[in-house]
């Protein structure tokens, strides 16, 4: 058997192609069944996100399995294969294993180290299991990838640190104020960036959030996107809301400053502490506001530096993460290579068990009908225990042998000594 992955991602395909090939969660089970219907695909799993579509397969015939998977992708979305092929990538053997582990760790993501992909890999495993698309090999692979993703995040911390302006704004506010659960937060604006601000604020513990926008309807629509209560105020209440806040974010499309020194000086108490974070371009807050005592102002340039510092830090952490990926890949490959021993071990166990059963029948026939049932159970347990004890060490040593040639010599010796005829099993090679 062989492992392969065929797919596309933000690295290989534009968004127009990714959109067309995206497979909704509700369709995944049906699509996996379509894949499994192909004669050379034994197992299948689909990982579909906004930035990637990847099909993982286990196949006895590598060339045929990959070809059938490519054809499936083309036919599923009605894209001619010659048009689709330039955007596809194919990884085989250990490269496919390494790829999934890097994906789960966020090392192949558009935002290096992002955490959402790990939950998406978990969901792909759940969907594959639910429709019986995954068996022993892909189940083990996805479990190993999820373990790798968790370990890398825990040991390297690669997922920490803001990587967007909105998250950096909230991270900065948290650093400056220590906690967001105390006091009032005002968000000025109701567009995409404002929504992200509210999302990050809630995630970091803010509980008293007010959204102010020129269009009250848009502000109300934003508030409805969250389960937590978000207060909404009309534009006329902007200054009064700011006067009651200790933290303000501005994110509007205004081409001129909406907050000036004169406006804030007229509503703030002397030396009133206030943190203003302006994520707009052009700036929403006039530079003169910084002259107010007790007021701190941060803009996009401050936030961009934070994002760049975090990005550079993640690049350093990625080196350590890659080393951990190699360790996890090698553990999986050891298990994968050990599957080559399964037919020999199974054949040996079957032969020894047959001998045990035959000898049990002979012994019982000599003991006669008066032999007690409880004695039979004891002898059954005794003989099975002897068989298991005898076979245990050879089986463990055979599976643990890392040298491929040495393991194959050991299997051949066992087959010759015990006259075994194991079923053919095509083991995965490292390359």
From Swiss-Prot:
CDD domains: NAD_bind_Glutamyl_tRNA_reduct (cd05213). It catalyses: (S)-4-amino-5-oxopentanoate + tRNA(Glu) + NADP(+) = L-glutamyl-tRNA(Glu) + NADPH + H(+). Keywords: Chlorophyll biosynthesis, NADP, Oxidoreductase, Porphyrin biosynthesis. It comes from the Bacteria. The keyword Oxidoreductase applies. GO terms for biological process: chlorophyll biosynthetic process; protoporphyrinogen IX biosynthetic process. This is Glutamyl-tRNA reductase. It comes from Synechococcus sp. (strain JA-3-3Ab).
